[in-house]
């Protein structure tokens, strides 16, 4: 049987490291890339393991509609489209540090989704 010495307290408390996925979506590519670069710069300053940004395929939403409201006249059509860009960033770190990193100012129009899983 092994006995612990009651005089010594544990020196290191191990912090749980999580696998964190940050998903960024936006219609504006420039603001999306700026937020992405800020997040990665903040993570690298804290010496975290970073993977990304992974550029996901752009979704293009299209709507085709008639120009004239009454239905008379020549059949002319308007075509509208909206492009949605998406980026993924993977981090390996404690969740407290991620709260500090994601507290940066995020551009308007950029949506951030954070998913936390155990490593």
Curated annotation (Swiss-Prot):
The record's InterPro entries line, in alphabetical order, gives: Ribosomal_uS10, Ribosomal_uS10_CS, Ribosomal_uS10_dom, Ribosomal_uS10_dom_sf, Ribosomal_uS10_euk/arc
Task: Tell whether Ribosomal protein is among the UniProt keywords.
Answer: yes
What biological processes does GO assign it?
translation
Which SUPFAM superfamilies does this entry report, sorted A to Z?
Ribosomal protein S10
Q: Where in the cell is it found?
A: Cytoplasm
- Major localisation: cytoplasm
Sorted alphabetically, which keywords does the UniProt record give? Cytoplasm, Ribonucleoprotein, Ribosomal protein
Example of a GO cellular component annotation carried by this entry: cytosolic small ribosomal subunit
- Give the highest taxon in the source lineage: Eukaryota
Q: How does it assemble?
A: Component of the 40S small ribosomal subunit.
Family recorded in the similarity comment: Belongs to the universal ribosomal protein uS10 family.
For this protein, the record's NCBIfam families field holds: uS10_euk_arch (TIGR01046)
Name the PANTHER family for this protein: 30S RIBOSOMAL PROTEIN S10 FAMILY MEMBER
Could you tell me what this protein is called?
A: Small ribosomal subunit protein uS10
What organism is recorded for this protein? Xenopus laevis (African clawed frog)
